Each structure stands twice: as C-alpha cells, then as structure tokens.
Amino acid sequence: MRLFSYNDCNMIYEAKEFVLNNGLKVVLRSPEKEDAYNLINQIISVASSTDYLLSTPSDFQHYVDDISKEEAFIEWSKTDSGYWLIACVEDKIVANCSLRFYKHEKDRHRGTIGIAITEEYQSMGIGSLMFDEMIKLATNTPGVEQIELDVIDNNEKGLRLYKSKGFVETGKIPHQLKLKDGTYLNGLTMVLFLNK
C-alpha cells in the first residue's frame, strides 16, 4: 500500500482577484522568485510594527544580505507540503499567509497556519479572505483534518479573526515570547477541525 504524499498535490495557488467591502482590489497568489525582495521587506515591515510575531527584523537580515536565499526559499515552498499566499494591492505585497502540513505518518492529518498583514492594510478583510482560501485548500487536501495556530493572548484582532473562522482555544503557552525589555507575552494554541 502506497502512503499519500503531499508531492501528489499541486501546492501552487493560481492568482485570483477579489474586491473587498471598501472597494479595494486584492490579488491572492503564490509568491514567485521575482517577489523575493518585496516579500522580505513586507515581512520585515510587519515584524517591525508588532510584538505579536515570533520573528524580529534581525531574523531576516540574512535574506536581505543575500536575496538569492529568499528566492530559493520561495522555490522550495512550491514543492514542500503546504501553501504560501501573498496578497497584492496594485502590485504591492501587503500580506502573506502560510499553511504547512506535517509530514510524519502519525501527524500528517495536521496543518499549521500563520499570517502577517502590513499594518495599514489590517482590518480591511484581507486576513479573512486569506484564511477562507487557506481553509478551502486544507479541506481539499487529502488526509488533512485540522489546522492549528499559536497566537499571543492579547492579540485582539488576531483572536477575533481566528474565532470567526471556527478556531477554538486548546491550550495556553506561558511566556511564549520574551521581548527585549525582559517582559513576556503569553500564547494560546488554537485549532480548527475541518468538516469534510
């Protein structure tokens, strides 16, 4: 008996245009190698504006120093077990969202999702749109039964989005992140059980 492999799936998301409630046109698509510079700058911009992300701008410096590393990562993401979407407004990358599936026999029914939206584009519906698309992709991926995420417990915008999509709290992570000033942020784990 042959086990399912995610390599059997096309992990590329073809570009789709959406119109938000405010009339803004947003294109969702998989990133291309040519997006590397703009994508890394979007990630650094978000990491600079919030403490809610695991990463800091300095964590991405090696990509800035050698953009070919980011280009290679983008190419790798197309063949790995998951999806990576970017949201573009007039060709500007304003958000990115990743959905990765676990690979081991005992946990391949699980996926993990993360999102980063540029501050001035938050609360417009882009996160909701990206999560809707990722949930559809996960639902249509054979064997995937649940999507998980971690969130800082006082990230009200994030919690509102995740709960609206059906994610439920499953645990607490004390001192999940430690900031430069020595203070800690506590985290929550959440899961969405997919109805297939």
Region roles according to the model:
Residues V26-N41:
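A short beta-loop-alpha structural element at the N-terminal edge
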Residues R2-N22, I173, G182-K196:
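Terminal substrate-recognition subdomain of acyl/acetyltransferases
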Residues F60-E120, F193-N195:
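Acetyl-CoA-dependent GNAT
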Residues F131, A138-D150:
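Conserved GNAT acetyl-CoA-binding A-motif
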Residues Q146-V151, K163-T183:
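Conserved catalytic-core motifs of GNAT/GCN5-like acyltransferases
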Residues I115-I117, S123-A138, L159-S164:
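Conserved acetyl-CoA-binding loop-helix of GNAT-fold acetyltransferases
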Residues T50-Q61:
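A short gly/proline-enriched turn/hairpin at secondary-structure junctions
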Residues I86, S98, T112-A116, G125, ...:
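Conserved beta-strand segments that form the floor/walls of ligand-binding pockets within enzyme
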